[in-house]
């Protein structure tokens, strides 16, 4: 959240989605929990949290942060893939959350994983996935991430994946209509074989990515047994705002919360749920 302003907006939105389903919740599974951006705050609030991730480094960092926060005794750390939940009985956790879109990185098992989340949740599920319609405009804007930079001169290794645009960037850009049509039809950002080859060469940090349509996500969750499914698209408003104004809105203390409130209301409207910055968020309850 110190590098990109869209992370601030996404986190604020997801916090509210999670808060809305916490009534009666004691136990939480955070699947694909990373360094504990959501699991540790929930543990601080008194919930019993299972923090599941496949990365040793993320688990180690999360443990360290949980200990520093004094909540390690309320957390269980599990090394596992989100595709390996078959061992958990039905209703193992009151709430299952999976945010920052790890479900989109387990293609072709994405629907299976969503079904597992619903199965092992007793009360509610909150999940975010990559958005097909939200991603599509990036085909026409190679510099889309720079709109959200907190500091245009930031020196961070992650920026090698987001090079600053130059005159050559725009002059050399050509639309690939065939690839764009393929993406709209399949939801796959790239051919899986191409992605695997790039990963082997160190040319991308991202695995095969499957991007959902909003109604597709809702259908899969409903068929698995989730009720009152609510969809939203965090970032639908902010992606229309120039970087200097975004920075003013988010870093002026008198404006920040009012702006985040407006973002949440706008981004939750059914008409824009597919046009979030990167993700579609879905939440729902068990009967």
Question: Which residues are covered by each model-predicted region?
Answer:
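A short SAM/SAH-binding and catalytic strip from SAM-dependent methyltransferases
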Residues: 95-109
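Conserved class I S-adenosyl-L-methionine
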Residues: 1-23, 37, 126-187
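A short glycine-rich, Lys/Arg-flanked "PGG" loop and its adjoining helix->strand segment in the class I
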Residues: 111-124
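Class I SAM-dependent methyltransferase "Motif I" SAM/SAH-binding loop
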Residues: 32-34
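Short alpha-helix
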Residues: 208-225, 231
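Class I SAM-dependent methyltransferase SAM/SAH-binding core
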Residues: 40-84
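A short acidic, Gly/Pro-enriched loop at the edge of an enzyme's catalytic core
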Residues: 87-95
């Amino acid at each position: 959240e110190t590098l990109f302003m869209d992370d601030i907006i996404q986190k604020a939105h997801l916090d509210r989605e999670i808060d809305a389903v916490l009534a009666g919740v004691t136990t939480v599974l955070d699947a694909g929990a990373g360094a504990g951006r959501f699991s540790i705050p929930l543990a601080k609030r008194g919930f019993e949290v299972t923090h599941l991730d496949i990365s040793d480094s993320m688990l180690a960092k999360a443990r360290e942060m949980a200990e520093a926060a004094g909540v390690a005794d309320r957390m269980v750390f599990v090394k596992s893939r989100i595709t390996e939940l078959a061992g958990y009985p039905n209703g193992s956790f009151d709430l299952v959350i999976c945010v920052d879109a790890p479900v989109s990185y387990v293609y072709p098992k994405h629907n299976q994983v969503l079904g597992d989340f619903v199965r092992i949740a007793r009360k509610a599920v909150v999940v975010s996935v990559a958005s097909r319609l939200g991603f599509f405009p990036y085909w026409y804007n190679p510099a889309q991430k720079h709109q959200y930079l907190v500091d245009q001169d930031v020196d961070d290794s992650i920026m090698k994946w987001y090079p600053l645009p130059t005159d050559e960037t725009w002059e050399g850009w050509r639309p690939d209509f065939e690839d764009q049509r393929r993406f709209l039809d399949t939801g796959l950002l790239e051919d899986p074989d191409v992605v695997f080859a790039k990963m082997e060469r160190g040319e991308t940090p991202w695995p095969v990515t499957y991007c959902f349509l909003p109604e597709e996500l809702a259908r899969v969750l409903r068929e698995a047994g989730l009720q009152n499914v609510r969809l939203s698209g965090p970032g639908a408003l902010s992606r229309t705002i120039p970087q200097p104004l975004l920075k003013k809105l988010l870093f002026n203390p008198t404006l920040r919360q009012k702006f985040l409130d407006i973002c949440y209301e706008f981004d939750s409207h059914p008409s824009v749920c597919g046009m979030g910055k990167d993700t579609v968020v879905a939440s729902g309850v068990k009967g």
